[in-house]
Amino acid sequence: MLKQLKNYRRIVVKIGSALLVDRAAGLKRDWLESLGQDIAALHHAGVEVLVVSSGAIALGRTVLGLPKKALKLEESQAAAAAGQIALAKAYADVLGGHSIRSGQILVTLSDTEERRRYLNARATIETLLKLKAVPVINENDTVATTEIRYGDNDRLAARVATMMGADLLVLLSDIDGLYTAPPHKNPDAEFLPLVETITPQIEAMAGAAASELSRGGMKTKLDAGKIANAAGTAMIITSGTRFGPLSAIDRGERATLFEPARAPVNAWKTWISGNLEPAGRLTVDAGAAKALKSGKSLLPAGVKEIDGQFERGDTVAVLNEDGREIARGLIAYDAEDARKIAGHKSDEISEILGYDARAAMIHRNDLVVRAASNAEVA
């Protein structure tokens, strides 16, 4: 059973574009007012609330009168520029009506994937919370490109939740939770009120995005769940289409709870695990996969194949022979040297490379292993 939201310490709420913006009418002001009432109730109860809000591009399209057809990159960026101003003002007005201050944070992928910028972003948001302001966070779509972006705010919200040590992430969506199949396609789909671990079977239940205003679907929400749950953050998926969507959770309206890992990883490994776009991928043999699960470092001898271009210290994914990701870590070699030593014993590395080097390709202190259930283990 879901506990009352007021019993959480810090909550990240993600709001999708389709909830905020109507293609013809623009901003759904009445709905936003109802959300503001929910946030205010939690805020005045001592709960810290952070908002990750989509909607800048969708709102900017309306503001600028752009056509319904797919936008070019520069048109999307222009729409975001216009929409961000309108969106920030709307939140400031709504929350200000409850004597709550807000602050806008626009981030790019590198703000969470590069350690120094990650720490700076965290410090800024933490300061806003100490000042009793509600941070309103969105991807900076005015400068993000197709190649370098989060791509959806579900995973951004999960990254924010883990970065800020939130104990709950709420994804407000156009669907009221997870089903065994997309319910709009399969009338026999069964609703799942609780997910203890996100298994491959759970992932297979995900469908595609249902709205042209949204970039994310159930798959991205499950990706968000894996990031959040591994760091000890619970996640709820519920419908945001009703007025007062947060208080609706407390009233017992339908929602799916994803339980956090029982043994969450530490802050350093949370950052590694949450990296959204690994720079490369290493395929390892069965022996290496077994060694990683027992807490060992990844040695070159067990590496069968290397994909991608990366530098020393970049985050890479480790795959088993079936192509499934089993770990993620910071690699001790660049791609060129890694390819040279792959498959070789550690005592051969110096002779191959011509300099003294580390025995491990990824040290266990820089490695996060995914258990079969998708929970993270150190």
UniProtKB/Swiss-Prot annotation:
The principal location of this protein is: cytoplasm
Q: Where does substrate bind?
A: S54, D141, N153
GO CC list:
cytosol
State which pathway it belongs to: Amino-acid biosynthesis; L-proline biosynthesis; L-glutamate 5-semialdehyde from L-glutamate: step 1/2
Q: Which Pfam families match?
A: AA_kinase, PUA
Biological role: Catalyzes the transfer of a phosphate group to glutamate to form L-glutamate 5-phosphate.
Q: What is this protein called?
A: Glutamate 5-kinase
